Regions:
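Loop-centered beta-sheet repeat module
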Residues: 61-115
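Beta-rich, blade/repeat-based domains predominating
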Residues: 3-17, 41-60, 89-104, 135-153, ...
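Blade-level signature of beta-propeller repeat domains, shared across WD40, Kelch, NHL, RCC1
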Residues: 203-209, 219-234
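Conserved beta-strand positions in repeat-built beta-propeller and related beta-rich domains
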Residues: 19-24, 66-69, 109-113, 158-161, ...
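A generic, well-ordered mixed alpha/beta core segment in the N-terminal half of proteins
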Residues: 1-36
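Structural signal for beta-propeller blades
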Residues: 25-28, 72-74, 115-117, 164-166, ...
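A short beta-strand motif characteristic of beta-propeller blades
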Residues: 1, 33-35, 39-46, 82-88, ...
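Short loop/turn segments immediately following beta-strands, especially the blade-tip
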Residues: 32-34, 79-80, 120-127, 169-175, ...
Length: 234
């Protein structure tokens, strides 16, 4: 058991296994080391308490990172989930998931509540915030929630639930340039990339859609899957 409510993300680091519990604002190092966050953010509906959403190791394996959507923070912890230091996104943004650059020098955080990406520079012992970039087109005025974030071949991809798209950014160290949008099915909660193919989980229309990176991001197949939430590869 994860010793919390609504477990939503899991990771391994060597032989250690970690998970986070969204509704109880906690992280666990299995089997029984629990870290419970305290506090709240400025959004009364979504940040009334801590909401841990992602756990993952930095590429150098020095820290276990835990994002807290309710506190607008990223916690950098030791292997026993003791907090070493934190990094913050702007208030009310809602830090959701992280992606790490191939060289390990940059961390990219998708902010669920404002549909943006905040870039941090990481030197192995601290992080510095750089810039925040919108993942939506300027003309979009509807409701949207940022969701998944991935890096593949010097591009960064972020899914939008509402605009129903995957935003494509070109990466230049700590700079991002929004270059394209892939239009998806309804509510693309998660996606992943392998062999130049994007596999996108469209939760509300029961499909997984496949796109070819080498063929101008063209839709090449649609698979029926009931309420898909996550896609991963062995």
């Amino acid at each position: 058991p994860t010793k919390g409510k609504v477990a939503c993300h899991i990771c391994t680091c060597d032989d250690d296994v970690y998970a986070v519990n969204y509704s109880s604002g906690s992280a666990i190092h299995f089997p029984d080391t629990l870290a419970v966050h305290e506090g709240k953010g400025i959004n009364p509906k979504r940040q009334e308490m801590p909401h841990t959403h992602f756990v993952g190791a930095t590429p150098d394996k020095k820290y276990i990172c835990v994002t807290d959507l309710g506190l607008d923070k990223i916690f950098f912890c030791d292997r026993n989930l003791n907090t070493c230091f934190t990094a913050a996104v702007p208030q009310g943004y809602g830090a959701r998931h992280l992606a790490f650059s191939d060289d390990g020098q940059y961390i990219y955080c998708v902010n669920e509540l404002v549909s943006s990406v905040t870039v941090f520079e990481y030197d192995g012992k601290s992080v510095k915030p750089r810039e925040t970039y919108s993942a939506l087109p300027n003309e979009f005025c509807g409701t949207n929630l940022g969701a998944a974030i991935r890096i593949y071949k010097n591009r960064l991809y972020v899914s939008n639930r509402g605009h129903n798209s995957i935003a494509v950014f070109d990466i230049n160290d700590d700079k991002l340039e929004l270059s394209d949008f892939i239009m998806t099915g309804d509510h693309p909660r998660d996606f992943n990339i392998a062999d130049d193919m994007i596999f996108c989980c469209n939760m509300n229309d029961d499909t997984v859609t496949l796109y070819s990176i080498n063929d101008s991001l063209r839709l090449i197949d649609t698979i029926s899957v009931k309420a898909p939430l996550c896609v991963n590869f062995e």
